[in-house]
Amino acid sequence: MQKQWQELKEYQKRLVAIDTSGWPISQQVDYHIVRAEMNGLEFDHRVLRPWSRDPSFYAVITTSEPDVPAREGPEIYGVLYMPDYEFPLKGEQKKEFQKKIQAVPILLAQAKKNLTEKGRDLWYFGIIQKEREINVLTGLSRRLMETNPDLVPLVDKAREAVGGFKSWLEEEHGSMARTSDGIG
């Protein structure tokens, strides 16, 4: 995230240095859209900081199609987005799946270090999300027994990591003050 922040600052400097005075309106609109996106990312870094306060940022698998063109809410890169996969997994799809599922234990170990701001409401929803992920991974493991049995141990290891992360969230959540983060 530090690298992203540094790159954002550099891109913002470059954007401000662009003289748009002679541009047609349509290109000026594009410029302002880019500026707005950069401002949004800056807001994420300065205010929201989902990587340090929201366990749901560390989603590892999702099964549903979003109801909007892009995914809603912050999420880490590399989520297993199940609608993208066709079973049995083959070729590049299988390689990508393996890479992402193998990263789950590493990702969640890092998440424990990154989650330094403890917001009770956000952590509660993170616990619910991890329970769903455990159920999805359990079902996926059963499905892969028929189509890709070689992947079952990787999915089981990921499920164990999610279970361990959920237990850690529950333990930490239990010791938090009963205050609200002001969600909603």
Question: Each predicted region: which residue ranges?
Answer:
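N-terminal maturation segment of proteins
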Residues: M1-G184
